[in-house]
Amino acid sequence: MNSAQVMNLGQLLNQSSRQFPQRIGLIQGDQQWTWHQLQERVHAMAHALQQLGVQKGDKILAQSRNNVQMFESCWVAFQLGCVWVPTNFRLSPPEVAYLAQSSHANVIICESVFAQHIDAALAAAPTLKHVIAIGPARPTEHSYEDLVTRNLGQQPSETVVSYDDPLWYFYTSGTTGKPKAGILTHGQMSFVVTNHLADLIPGTNENDCSIAVAPLSHGAGIHALLNVARGAPTILLPTEKLIPEMFWQLVEKHRVTNLFTVPTIVKMLVEDEAVDRYDHSSLKYLIYAGAPMYRADQKFALQKLGNVLVQYFGLGEVTGCITVLPKHMHSADDANPNANIGSCGRPRTGMQVAVLKEDLSPAAQGEIGEICCRGPAVFAGYYGNEDATQKALRGGWFHTGDLGYLDDRGFLFISGRQSDMYISGGSNVYPKEVEEVILNHPDVAEVAIVGMPDPKWGEVGVAVIVKRDEHKNLSGEDILAFLDGKTARYRWPRHIQFWSALPKSGYGKVAKKDIQALLQQQEHSQ
């Protein structure tokens, strides 16, 4: 354990308020807040919670859509030395109850519209003592805005932290079982913010502007920290649903320079006709992560937006800090060696990346193994789950569960999740390789391939395809004919289905577990 004192990450907000008190820090709809106003509100809420008995180490659960209170809640937690436990607001009451119980939450900051979630959390978590309602408060609850109003001008007592003091429980869904709380610490996150600024949005300052298109509870929240550190404002969408037309309007109006999202959202935004009606020349960095981006989608985005794409690869446990493919390493020209087709880039600054075999020895160049990393961005473990921690950190490396290989330059190529790979007739099949080929078909918009049990082959691939035009006549035979000569036959999906849409997670990732479950339901109903 590292007991050395470090800067409380909450100081980032204080520093921007001191440097740029009258500059805008947050915008949502027709409302905006200066850095000074945000700091005053955060100090007021932190003081109010201290008066309620909240102290260092307590856990603050946050269940809310993106709004100023959700944005502030992490800074309140950080400055108090508490642990921020954000949820995806789309979770059900039982799912939020599990997070409250497993994190031993002491406080819940929650929008009033999620009253059922509050009640479920209170029933499941005996540690939960205080409910702070965003919106109308019930008799047993405190109103967020009332607490802020009554405590404006008050200063919370300063909380000193050490390197290993936790500040965020980053829940990861994983491939099996219940979500696990990855412990992010003040020391680790100070490195992460510095690393992201250096590798993802270098040169960002108070004259830049960011827009959040995903819930602040995960990657979008981490990206918001970077902009706070540089005094750059963040725009929150005024609607729960992402509307491409509105997005491009906001980019033009506020001269947005950077954003973080996932490949499916990039695809949706650049394929919408609104992209051609608004000025997006201010964009410097469109950062994508969370899932592979198919080459066809990457090329289209580059053609529409110019050289602004930045890819990073990483998991919540290392807050994305494994590899980066900067914008100068992207190209829409397949013949350009700097296109780095299929690669997710080079190791992040200060991080070491390795591909290991099952015995933890290094895989040869070009040999597929498990992608592992080590460095200051690695988390402190899973809260209350020592077995999972030991498994994830065995041999002195963080094990991602992703498969890939390194080329002669040390650039990383991902083959897929260990859990995505299936074995058909004794051969390992990595769906991503086949998905890439199918996506080059002009009539295919989206595709996902999953392994399903088969009495003859052990497992076979099932491809689920979304057509660009639902009225287009496209058959499974057409897809197989397209694959012929482009990839080995043993990799071909055994079954092909056409769906109107692919199920996605709350963060826009294709949910392969849900696809498998739906396919199993089909099988059982036959």
Please provide the spans of the model-predicted regions.
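Structural core segment of the AMP-binding/adenylate-forming
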Residues: N14, Q51-L52, Q79-V148, D469
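Conserved AMP-binding/adenylation subdomain of ANL enzymes
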Residues: S190-C209, S217-T257, D272
